[in-house]
Amino acid sequence: MKEKITVLIADDNKDFSQTLAGYLEKQEDMEVIGMAKDGAEAVEMIANTIPDIALIDIIMPHLDGIGVLEKIGKLNLPKRPTCIMLSAVGQDKITQRAILLGAEYYVVKP
């Protein structure tokens, strides 16, 4: 059996996180291994679980998504997760900064 793609969701909107997790769990090849409610928790969970994919909201308490990218960039991880940024706003300046810090994709939330 093929290994599942592990996903960590970092978003302070609990309803959105649960809806997204529910959708991802229905995919045969994906497994949600954690849901962080703020940026500090996201960094800790990424360091401890090293997911294949990290879905990171830009606007979160304690540490925003840009801060999460900065912190995980400084961690000595054996493998950096593919980071996909989520945001309700699509500002070019923020998008460019996220990509510069290693985000692979930037998705504007509905």
For each of these PLM feature ranges, what is it?
Residues A10-D11, A36, A54:
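Conserved sequence signature across two-component system core domains
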Residues K14-G34:
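Two-component/phosphorelay signaling modules centered on CheY-like receiver
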Residues D38-E41, D64-E70:
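Acidic catalytic/metal-coordinating carboxylates
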Residues A47-T49, G73-R80, L101:
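Conserved phosphotransfer cores of two-component systems
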Residues T49-L55:
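Active-site beta3 strand of CheY-like receiver
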Residues M60:
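Receiver (REC) domain active-site loop signature in two-component systems and cognate sites
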Residues G67, G90-V107:
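Alpha4 helix (beta4-alpha4-beta5 surface) of REC/receiver domains from two-component response regulators
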